[in-house]
Design a protein with these regions (language model features):
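Extracellular/luminal regions of secreted and cell-surface proteins that mediate adhesion/ECM remodeling
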Residues: 28-220
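Beta-propeller fold recognition
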Residues: 1-28
């Protein structure tokens, strides 16, 4: 069904304008399936034989079975397999590819695409699902932002605050953190907490810095 409606609104010159538009209600498709999630693998220390697990959804009204599947890594087809079960209308099913994938290069981000290839699929735009997965380094932590102090008036002895992130796969604790102002002597302290993989935390240095003199300061 197509519905037409008219709306009045103010234009940029404060004059009334009329807009005529339409929208359509559709009963959907009988044959329409697609991959709606890639649940495995996740970011971490990965190997040359990683299992790929996906979720398949039946978006259509007709039950579907024997659904062809394709698996790609960085655009390269690595597997063509078949889901042999049956998925009812608007339901999902999990599938694990028999073919594993090589994600063993440390520090590399891979693009994984899983796709249905149902013959007669009436809406193919929702067939594929893509996920980026990174093979994290074991130990990789760094400062991503200095959040304090900020430019302003009336500055004095100010606390230096930084956001730290664990980019690696292993939890990190008891590591040195430092700041330097205008290329001077580094102020080194120890972060005694624990940052889990891909987690961010705020660290406030105990030793403050003097910003009372007018001017621009470079903090690294």
């Amino acid at each position: 069904f197509t519905f037409w409606y008219t709306a009045d609104f103010f234009s940029s010159n404060n004059a009334w304008r009329t807009q005529i538009a339409s929208y359509r209600l559709s009963g959907g498709f009988a044959n329409d399936v697609g991959v709606n999630a890639i649940t495995q693998p996740e970011n971490g220390i990965l190997t040359n034989a990683e299992t790929v697990e996906i979720s398949i959804r039946n978006f259509g009204s007709a039950p579907q079975s024997n659904i062809p599947l394709e698996l790609r890594v960085d655009g390269n087809l690595v597997a063509s397999e078949t889901f042999t079960g049956t998925i009812l209308e608007n339901e999902t099913a999990n599938y694990t590819f028999t073919q594993t994938v090589d994600l063993s290069a440390s520090g590399q981000t891979y693009s994984i695409e899983a796709k249905t290839a149902l013959v007669g699929d009436e809406f193919t735009a929702n067939d594929p699902f893509t996920k980026e997965v990174t093979n994290l380094l074991s130990n990789d932590v760094g400062a991503i932002e200095i959040t304090a102090p900020v430019s302003g008036t009336g500055l004095g002895n100010e606390t230096i605050s930084v956001n730290l992130k664990n980019f690696g796969a292993l939890p990190q604790s008891n590591f040195d953190v430092q700041y330097v102002i205008d290329g001077g002597t580094p102020v080194v302290e120890t972060f005694t907490g624990t940052i889990n993989s891909e987690e961010e935390v705020v660290y406030n240095f105990t030793q403050t810095a003097d910003f009372s003199a007018l001017g621009t300061y470079n903090i690294t």
